[in-house]
């Protein structure tokens, strides 16, 4: 049986798409190889949202080219945001790649089965892509140029897929999209994300629902109310702010001010006092002054996120920022600001996690890692515990006895659902 190997970089959507492609390869008669050197087919699922990510992809492709020179039978497949909408130019740049297809698409060199392409035994927490693309065109972001405009899947189709995942063993679904809060506006019935959450909540056996990523300007009160009232929907929200200074937010074309963002956070915390917030932040955006960075730092400190995904600005081709704005913040200053935010995050999360010691939490157990059970709280915090019981897929109550910045240690108190 020929082997396949997956190399994926980037967001959770890329991870979900790679899992689906892996299952398709298995239906075509391939088996998963331990390493690229043992495979007849290697898939590279690419990311170009940052320059560093794009460089990693290109480096990996050149490594595979050398591997192909040694093994002419090796087939290389490329998808993801490096491909985007222009396959011809990518093929010209990487002529040694055998198969190239757009992100979110399926390859055309084999028979595509009808229905959903799902693993026989999906993970406890399974991802579902509810929409592709983005219509926002933030000035720094390459995603709309590579994944195209927003295209949503119907509620009925998504509910069928979620129900089938649950039938095969999943207990949680994570809804994915570049901007899930604009879900449905392109469909004839004009449903919204809240409508989808209500529909999914009716699926028997589904214990939890998460979604990401959100855009602050598109979060409605209807969505907040749905999150607060539906017990299956986790009180966890990825809410990228990107900057704390209004001048920079306007230059980014984000569509809100820092005060509007703070007001939104206030409404979320009023509706769900236990909500866990994560954010994305760019430091060193063109023309960002020290004072403007200080405003970002203050915003991070005031809100107290459970996770801050911070990155130094890097120009992306095709974007308005790369075309019209000078990348004028020195690299050393970008690194300094990056380090300040990373240090703040560690301090903030350490303090928040330490406050959870001796408290109880509801955890969905996802599997084992290093001889311990691993799961997540409703807020998405990673929890490890020891037990000889078969806990995979169980919803349990635990008591936390130890905390670190990135995980919690706990003891089993009670199995709530098995």
From Swiss-Prot:
Family annotation (PROSITE patterns)? MTTASE_N, MTTASE_RADICAL, RADICAL_SAM, TRAM
Residues forming the MTTase N-terminal domain are: 2-118
Where are its TM segments located?
A: none
Q: Which InterPro entries match?
A: Elp3/MiaA/NifB-like_rSAM (IPR006638), Methylthiotransferase (IPR005839), Methylthiotransferase_CS (IPR020612), Methylthiotransferase_N (IPR013848), Methylthiotransferase_N_sf (IPR038135), MiaB_methiolase (IPR006463), rSAM (IPR007197), rSAM_horseshoe (IPR023404)
Q: Any coiled-coil ranges, and where?
A: none
The cofactor named in the record is:
[4Fe-4S] cluster
Top enzyme class: transferase
The annotation note on the cofactor reads:
Binds 2 [4Fe-4S] clusters. One cluster is coordinated with 3 cysteines and an exchangeable S-adenosyl-L-methionine.
Q: Name one GO cellular component term.
A: cytosol
Sequence ranges assigned to domain Radical SAM core in this UniProt record = 120-352
Functional summary from the UniProt entry: Catalyzes the methylthiolation of N6-(dimethylallyl)adenosine (i(6)A), leading to the formation of 2-methylthio-N6-(dimethylallyl)adenosine (ms(2)i(6)A) at position 37 in tRNAs that read codons beginning with uridine.
Q: Which NCBIfam families match?
A: MiaB/RimO family radical SAM methylthiotransferase, PRK14336.1
Q: How does it assemble?
A: Monomer.
- Annotated protein name in UniProt: tRNA-2-methylthio-N(6)-dimethylallyladenosine synthase
**Source species of the chain:** Dehalococcoides mccartyi (strain ATCC BAA-2266 / KCTC 15142 / 195) (Dehalococcoides ethenogenes (strain 195))
């Amino acid at each position: 049986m020929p082997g396949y190997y997956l190399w994926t970089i980037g967001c959770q959507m890329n991870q979900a798409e790679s899992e689906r492609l892996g299952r398709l390869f298995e239906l075509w008669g391939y088996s998963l190889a331990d390493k690229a050197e043992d495979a007849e087919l290697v898939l590279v699922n690419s990311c170009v949202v940052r320059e560093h990510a794009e460089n990693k992809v290109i480096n990996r492709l050149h490594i595979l080219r050398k591997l192909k020179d040694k093994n002419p039978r090796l087939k290389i497949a490329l998808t993801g945001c490096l491909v985007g909408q222009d396959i011809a130019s990518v093929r010209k740049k990487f002529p040694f790649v055998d198969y190239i297809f757009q992100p979110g698409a399926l390859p055309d060199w084999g028979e595509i089965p009808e229905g959903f392409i799902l693993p026989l035994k999906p993970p406890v927490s399974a991802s579902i892509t509810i929409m592709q693309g983005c219509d926002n065109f933030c000035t720094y972001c390459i995603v709309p140029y590579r994944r195209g405009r927003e295209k949503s899947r119907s509620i009925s189709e998504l509910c069928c897929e979620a129900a089938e995942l649950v039938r095969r063993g999943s207990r949680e679904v994570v809804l994915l999209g570049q901007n899930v809060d604009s879900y449905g506006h392109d469909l004839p019935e004009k449903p919204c994300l809240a409508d989808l959450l209500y529909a999914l909540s009716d699926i028997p056996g589904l214990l939890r629902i998460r979604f990401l990523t959100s855009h602050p300007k598109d979060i409605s009160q209807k969505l907040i109310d749905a999150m607060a009232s539906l017990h299956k929907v986790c009180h966890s929200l990825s809410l990228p702010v990107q900057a704390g200074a209004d001048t920079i937010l306007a230059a980014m074309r984000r569509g809100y001010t820092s005060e509007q963002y703070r007001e939104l956070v206030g409404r979320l915390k009023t509706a769900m006092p236990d909500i866990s917030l994560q954010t994305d932040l760019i430091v060193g955006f063109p023309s960002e002054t020290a004072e403007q960075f200080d405003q970002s730092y203050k915003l991070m400190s005031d809100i107290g996120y459970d996770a801050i995904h911070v990155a130094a600005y890097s120009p992306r081709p095709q974007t308005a920022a790369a075309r019209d704005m000078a990348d004028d913040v020195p690299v050393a200053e970008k690194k300094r600001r990056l380090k300040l935010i990373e240090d703040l995050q560690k301090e903030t999360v350490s303090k928040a996690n330490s406050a959870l010691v001796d408290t109880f939490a509801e955890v969905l157990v996802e599997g084992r890692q290093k001889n311990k059970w691993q799961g997540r709280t409703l807020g998405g915090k990673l929890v490890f515990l020891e037990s000889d019981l078969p806990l995979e897929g169980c919803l349990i109550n635990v008591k936390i006895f130890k905390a670190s910045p990135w995980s919690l240690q706990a003891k089993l108190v009670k199995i709530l659902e098995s």
